[in-house]
Amino acid sequence: IYVTNNLIAPTTVHWHGVFLPNGMDGVGGLTQPAIKPGQTFKYEWTVRQSGTFMYHSHHDEMTQMAMGMMGMMIFHPRHQPPEYQVDRDFAIMLSEWRLDPGTFRPNPNEMKDFNVLTMTARCFPGTDPLVAKLGDRIRIRLGNLSAMDHHSIHLHGHYFKVTATNGGRLPVSAQWLETTVLVPVGSTRDIEFIASENGDWPLHCHMTHHVMNQILHNFRNVIVIKKATPADQIRAILPYYMPFG
């Protein structure tokens, strides 16, 4: 993986939870010199595990991660057992930000008072629906690189199995049924279920102040609506509102 630094500041990339040589771990000043502006660094390793993983800056983390330098990686097993097969495979990155009134850039100095909570860099109603057919077997991969908050992710209308953590896929005997799964900061969780009921079903964090930030309240059901329409309507009330991302 070639990483070219187009920032005005040094950076690195850390491959979170991945088994790799020490020199490829991406911690600036410890396992490698930071990548200077304009430079390219090659990260190289042999993939020895499958699962859901994340990557993020590991240099001036408070600033660079708070500005969105993060993402997800999925390593599929070379030989997939039957129980691994799904019809729909989704990935959602959970994050949080501080956006002051009248601004469009997150405040990287905030430590606890976050007011925008996002799923894959968007907050409701700018989030994309997870579309599936009745009877589909669905996997949702959840990763949390929020600065300070865990998220208890709840699915309406169905129960699911927790099938994997950032330590890898769980043996069938260790998987458990749930309707809500806690995704701690720096962790991943895979959940799997059968789409057994028709309809638009919410998927949200169940911490109430997180729910109020992005899910459902006082608005029509916008699971499959065009993002621009509700955004314009909300701006009539809150002039500085924007669907993040």
Describe every region a protein language model picked out:
Residues I1-G245:
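Copper-binding active sites and cupredoxin-like electron-transfer domains
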